[in-house]
Amino acid sequence: MKITVVCVGKIKEKYLTMAIEEYSKRLSRYCKLEIIELADEKTPDNASPAEELQIKKKEGERILKNIKDNAYVIALAIEGKMLSSEELADKMQLLGVNGESHLAFVIGGSLGLDSEVLDRADFKLSFSKMTFPHQVMRTILLEQVYRGFRIMSGEPYHK
């Protein structure tokens, strides 16, 4: 299975980069992982709602250009469906059984995802009703995908 993570924003913190590298290495046993890091738009502190929409639209266009037509798209969104680790593993396994060989997870920038990206998504996944920094979310996502593959393989994982 191929897993693509399309994300807006650069990781600047070394500890997050190290965690992402570690989970990328661990995932290499289970899938072909590609992380596509896209530039984020600068958001003024006092941005109007119209400016925020324009920023999300620009970031959304970049995201959509980097999603392959054959990918099953999972957008990370607060309004999405919350799953347990086991349920995420089941979903990934069922998608694989049903012939989906390419999953693309999408993480938006600080303002979230544009409506066109959400419309393109085959599934909207929420990790929490809380908001997380998008840089931290990348690490959390990779850990959960790794945990999902461990569960699917019947290997032990920390509960």
Curated annotation (Swiss-Prot):
Q: What is any one of the record's Gene Ontology cellular component terms?
A: cytoplasm
The main place the protein resides is cytoplasm
Q: What is its EC number?
A: 2.1.1.177
- Is the keyword ATP-binding assigned to this protein? no
- UniProt keyword list: Cytoplasm, Methyltransferase, rRNA processing, S-adenosyl-L-methionine, Transferase
| Pfam families on file | SPOUT_MTase (PF02590)
Catalytic EC class = transferase
- Cell compartment(s), UniProt: Cytoplasm
Query: Which Cys-Cys disulphide bridges does the record give?
Result: none
Instruction: Give the matching CDD domains.
Output: RlmH-like
Q: What does this protein do?
A: Specifically methylates the pseudouridine at position 1915 (m3Psi1915) in 23S rRNA.
The subunit field of the Swiss-Prot or TrEMBL record says: Homodimer.
Name this protein carries in UniProt: Ribosomal RNA large subunit methyltransferase H
What's the source species for this entry? Lachnoclostridium phytofermentans (strain ATCC 700394 / DSM 18823 / ISDg)
Q: Which classification does the entry list for the species?
A: Bacteria, Bacillati, Bacillota, Clostridia, Lachnospirales
| Gene that this sequence comes from | rlmH
